[in-house]
Amino acid sequence: MNWQDECYLLSKRKFRENANIINVFTNNYGKMSGIVYGGNSRKIRNYLQISNKIIVEYIAKNENKIGYFKTELVDPNAPRYFNDKKRTAALLSMTSLLNSLLPEAQPYKEIYLSLRILINNLTLSNWAYLYLFWELDLIKKLGFDQNLNQFFNNSTENNGVVKAEVDNIKYKIPNFLIKNKVPEQHSDEDLKSGFIFTRT
């Protein structure tokens, strides 16, 4: 089975002396694993960084055994934010979530598109809000919809929180998540409540 596709690097681990086993999220094939021979060489190591966009050519002689990748850099997302701890943390969080939650070899084109849009939007000032929306959308697309619409009412302001109970657990849900709209006034406290909600 041979194919070529664009993808984002989700994880990598050393394999033998000069190779890596990597997990990638591809546009057409979903999450895939493969060996990159020479992955620890200076040339390949420099761009084989988590969240970087690459093109992979997958070659497998036997469907029952892991194949190997030939790789080529497309967009160096990781080094772009080396000096920005928060955006770097966001990139690592995105890739870690996808690596943990996505099943192997099942295409999720909508999730792939949403990831590409989010990474492109990390340059915006409201990127943290967009990240939270992305997390909720990811959960929904994987079949775990929180159905926040049940807490919506016309008097709900963009700022502040709603105290609610979901699955017998009490939460403080930021109103901007319920309305699915970036608030005009950015609030660190609301963002904190949002991250607490999506991680519990």
Feature names for model-found ranges:
Residues M1-N20, F25-T200:
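Non-catalytic alpha-helical scaffolds and adjoining flexible linkers that form interface surfaces
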